[in-house]
Structure formats: structure tokens, C-alpha cells
Curated annotation (Swiss-Prot):
GO biological process, one term: carbohydrate transport
Assembly and oligomerization: Interacts with TRPV2; the interaction probably occurs intracellularly and depends on TRPV2 N-glycosylation.
Family matches, as Gene3D superfamilies: 1.20.1280.290
Keywords: Cell membrane, Golgi apparatus, Membrane, Repeat, Sugar transport, Transmembrane, Transmembrane helix, Transport
Molecular function per GO: glucoside transmembrane transporter activity; sugar transmembrane transporter activity
Upper classification of the organism: Eukaryota, Metazoa, Chordata, Craniata, Vertebrata
Cellular compartments annotated: Golgi apparatus membrane; Cell membrane
Gene this chain is encoded by: Slc50a1
Function comment: Mediates sugar transport across membranes. May stimulate V(D)J recombination by the activation of RAG1.
Membrane topology: Multi-pass membrane protein
Transmembrane segments: 3-23, 44-63, 68-88, 102-122, 129-149, 160-180, 186-206
Region Mediates interaction with TRPV2: start-end pairs: 149-221
Pfam family, one: MtN3_slv
Name this protein carries in UniProt: Sugar transporter SWEET1
Length: 221
């Protein structure tokens, strides 16, 4: 195998490993729901939006014939669906959860109808679907910025997950390089905000470490 082939194979494996590691951080929430038989302060929307994101990128991977995208987003969609079902089972507000799920499901079905029925040209469909997935991914990476501002204000990293931060940073970096190797801006560009927010989170962990965070909360009580 040539050096370029080895590098591509290694990069593909890194994308799969780091991204599945990022998705599996939700297993701690799943165990918490099973142990406490409640959802406590666990947020539902990230599970739902990540599932939609996985399904979108899965479709893009199928159209592009990219095995790495297909594997990662198939497993990701299965995991997120599992988290959604567990949340629905333990949530006391089942009506609100079902309403949010049905709304995004309807949007997803409309999107599939548009891309597969109204855009017959394969290349145009691939470009438009890639653009949609890119914009959706960027919005997901940028959505926690308000929480980051609150962390700076309170000097507390309590609401941040260090393992998720590392997994997101590694995943975003590997996908950006992967997209660059494929000359696919729809893969490269949306992962750049993930690298940026990942570095910001690491800086916050360095500036407000868990030990200092605990002392700060004790002083506030």
C-alpha cells in the first residue's frame, strides 16, 4: 500500500474512532437515566439535533459513496435514537418530547422528499445536501457559545464535560483534515467551528480547573 493510501486509511480510522467516542459520551447520561429513573437536568434537544445531523450526513455519505461517513453516522444515528427513546421513557413531559421529535421528523421527511424527488440531478443533490448538512453542523457547534459566556461569567466549568470536549476537538480536527484530503469543503468547513469551540473549552478548563471551580462554588454558598 502506498504512503498516501496508508495515510488515508489511518485518517479514516481516526475519524471513526474519535467521532464514535464523541457519540458514546451520551452513554453516561443513559446510565444516569437508568439509575435514577429520571432525566434530571439532562437536555433532550442535543440528542434530537445530533440524530438529525447523523441522518443528514448518512444520506450524504450514501450519495457520495463514502464508507467512513456511512459507518460513523449509522452508528451515531442508532446511539442517538437509543438516547431519545430512553429520554422519552423516563421523562415526565412526554408530550413535549414527542412534539419536538415529531416536528424535527417532519422537517427531516420534507427534506428527504425535496432532495430525492425534486432534485433529480445527482451532482446538484449532493451539493445541496452537503450545504444543508454543513450549515446544520455549524449551527450545532456554535449553539453552546451562550453557555461558554456564562462559564466565563461564573468562573465555573461545572456545566462542561471534559471528555466530550476532548472527543469533539479530536473528531473535528480529524474530519477537517479528512475533508481537506478529499477536497470536500462540505466536510472541512463545518468542522472548523468545532476545533475553535474545542480549544475555547480547553482554555476554560485550564483557567477554571475543577478544583478551583469547587472552591469558587463553596465561597458563593
Amino acid at each position: 500500500m502506498e504512503a498516501g493510501g496508508v495515510a488515508d486509511s489511518f485518517l479514516s480510522s481516526a475519524c471513526v474512532l474519535f467521532t464514535l467516542g464523541m457519540f458514546s459520551t451520551g452513554l453516561s447520561d443513559l446510565r444516569h437515566m437508568q439509575r435514577t429513573r429520571s432525566v434530571d437536568n439532562i437536555q433532550f434537544l442535543p440528542f434530537l439535533t445530533t440524530d438529525v445531523n447523523n441522518l443528514g450526513w448518512l444520506s450524504y455519505g450514501v450519495l457520495k459513496g463514502d464508507g467512513t461517513l456511512i459507518i460513523v453516522n449509522t452508528v451515531g444515528a442508532v446511539l442517538q435514537t437509543l438516547y431519545i427513546l430512553a429520554y422519552l421513557h423516563y421523562s415526565p413531559q412526554k408530550h413535549a418530547v414527542l412534539l419536538q421529535t415529531a416536528t424535527l421528523l417532519a422537517v427531516l421527511l420534507l427534506g428527504y422528499g425535496y432532495f430525492w424527488l425534486l432534485v433529480p440531478d445527482l451532482e446538484t443533490r449532493l451539493q445541496q445536501l452537503g450545504l444543508f448538512c454543513s450549515v446544520f453542523t455549524i449551527s450545532m457547534y456554535l449553539s453552546p457559545l451562550a453557555d461558554l459566556a456564562k462559564i466565563i461569567q461564573t468562573k465555573s466549568t461545572q456545566r462542561l464535560s471534559f471528555s466530550l470536549t476532548i472527543a469533539t476537538l479530536l473528531s473535528s480536527t480529524s474530519w477537517s483534515i479528512y475533508g481537506f484530503r478529499l477536497k470536500d469543503p462540505y466536510i472541512t468547513v463545518p468542522n472548523l467551528p468545532g476545533i475553535l469551540t474545542g480549544f475555547i473549552r480547553l482554555v476554560l478548563f485550564y483557567k477554571y480547573p475543577p478544583e478551583q471551580d469547587t472552591k469558587y462554588r463553596l465561597l458563593q454558598t
